[in-house]
Amino acid sequence: LSRFLRVVNRVIHHIVLRPAWVLPLCSHKNLAMTLIASVSGIRGTIGGGVGSNLTPLDAVAFASAYGQWLRTQSGSDRRLRVALGRDARTSGEALSDLVVSTLRFQGIDVLDLGLSTTPTVEMMVPWEGCDGGIILTASHNPGDWNALKLLNAKGEFLSAEDGAKILKAREEGNFIFSPVSELGLRIAVNDGIERHIQAILNLDLVDADAIRARGFSIAVDAVASTGGIAIPMLLKALGVARIEGLHCEPTGHFPHNPEPLRKHLDEICALVPETKCDLGIVVDPDVDRLVFVSEDGELFGEEYTLVAVADYLLQHHPGHVVSNLSSSRALRDIAERHNSTYSASAVGEVHVVAEMKAKGAVLGGEGNGGIILPELHYGRDALVGVALFLTYLAQRGGTCSALRATYPNYAMAKEKMDLDPSIDTDALLARVAVAHQELNPSTVDGVKIDFPDRWVHLRKSNTEPIIRIYTEAPTQAEAEALATEFAAKLSSL
């Protein structure tokens, strides 16, 4: 034990001499490798060098910092508990062993959920009286990535202030480990997803009887991760008549790029009409993003997942809804249709949740297919999104494409502009805001300018010298033209 601790501390002091944000490296295969540490956790590519990739030693250092922060937060010597789950990435089991062992050496009990989903871990934290949680997933990043995503005692992502404390603890590296008589326990928990599904079935707005009566046939693309466990289990519990599984074995060998964008979804878009399914369901590796495919093989629209769920919920519970500044205007339109109100937050789940709490919102989310239902928990949850969407479709009748046709039709474009690292990005965005001050642009997160029938959102990256340009307009051509126009304006400024 003493030799292990000496090695860990030597490694930690080596790691913290390096910058704490983005550290690119070329491996022996000449592939760009990256480690990104931020207030929400640490993510990176597996392999390569310490401090430049997500290596075992980086994982130990970051887990140690999190464990020490939890101890400080508790303000006592009581036994701490952490819930931990992972997606199906091939590096996940080994990474889990490292993180669990590190926390145990800090005297922390770990409730190991094994293969799980991000929303399941989030819910298990308060259910099990845990002091925090860790999700091992790089979300929609490719399979050579992994990450430690950190939760507080509410099962929510950390605030910027708390995240900064963990980064500081990692930089200082003065970790204290427990004597052998006080090592934490590893406790296997095997029913997390079942409990999550039961909580969804208990919601008043989820009508399993209506879904069962409709006799749905549904195709599922789970990208060979844990959605292949959770989504079919949920559909069976809801009474879905037939499930066509596509990549539902959680091998972690992603069959296509795991980000649920149209260009990656040819297989399921073909499978749905070929097998005469009523719709298709696509989730990302950790099951917090949700995309539907209509019966004709066309995407329902990632931005419209939240719109459809809001349409259903606001008919029963009018109130306030929240999305981020880069999400479609369609959510605001639907809120107005139901005599409800809308506001936008900065990009990022933690900001959406903060705005929801401030406004007492009944629903929130992000345009990437993330649904946040505070009645269940404050986290993006594809499972509850599926249950609410199917309930609505079952109750109203008709097809997915017919439902989609009832919503305002907007098109989005996303671009990025590379900058010289010496450029003051904040000053550049400020000049854009001044140039359009008559339109009262939002500066909550970069600059967002609303025009009568379109908008543009410019925001700097926290990890790269670029500005991201998001636009929405009545047609795809107009959205792309607006993005090009503002890229040119940025260049001229």
Predicted regions and their residues:
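Phosphate-binding and adjacent anionic-ligand microenvironments
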Residues: 279, 317-493
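N-terminal small/polar loop signature for handling phosphorylated ligands or for N-terminal nucleophile
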Residues: 68-75, 81-145, 233-293
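Proline/glycine-rich low-complexity loops and linkers
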Residues: 113, 165-198, 202, 294-367, ...
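An N-terminal, well-structured beta->alpha segment
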Residues: 27-101, 105-106, 186-218
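Gly/Ser/Thr-enriched, mixed-charge loops and adjacent short helices
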Residues: 45, 146-275
